[in-house]
UniProtKB/Swiss-Prot annotation:
Its EC number is 6.3.5.-. HAMAP family: GatC. Keywords: ATP-binding, Ligase, Nucleotide-binding, Protein biosynthesis. The lineage of its organism: Bacteria, Pseudomonadati, Pseudomonadota, Betaproteobacteria, Burkholderiales. This is Aspartyl/glutamyl-tRNA(Asn/Gln) amidotransferase subunit C.
Length: 99
């Protein structure tokens, strides 16, 4: 997959960005370089290779030190929603921003 200058212009427009011609060309080169790298990675045969969770795990035995998941603060929903202009079913009600 590779993008064209038209694709970059369209994406910039959707993101409300104004890109100069040089910036657009630089973005095109960088993004197409990224896609080329992804295609190279996809081409590698990884059959029989165990997924890697952490790169250090390849050279030493590590165990992820995760804390116990426990409540540390009380539920303050009502206090936080006290000044909300609109609520519905216990949730903040906001205007629709995406059509």
């Amino acid at each position: 997959m590779s993008l064209t200058s038209t694709d970059i212009a369209r994406i910039a427009n959707l993101a409300r960005l104004e890109l100069k011609a040089a910036e657009s060309e630089r973005m095109l080169t960088q993004i197409n370089g990224f896609f080329a790298l992804v295609e190279k990675m996809r081409a590698v045969d990884t059959t029989g290779i165990e997924p890697l969770a952490h790169p250090v795990a390849t050279v030493q035995d590590i165990t992820l030190r995760l804390r116990e998941d426990r409540v540390s603060e009380p539920n303050q929903r009502e206090a936080n929603q006290r000044n909300a202009p609109a609520l519905e079913h216990g949730l903040f009600l906001v205007p629709k921003v995406i059509e």
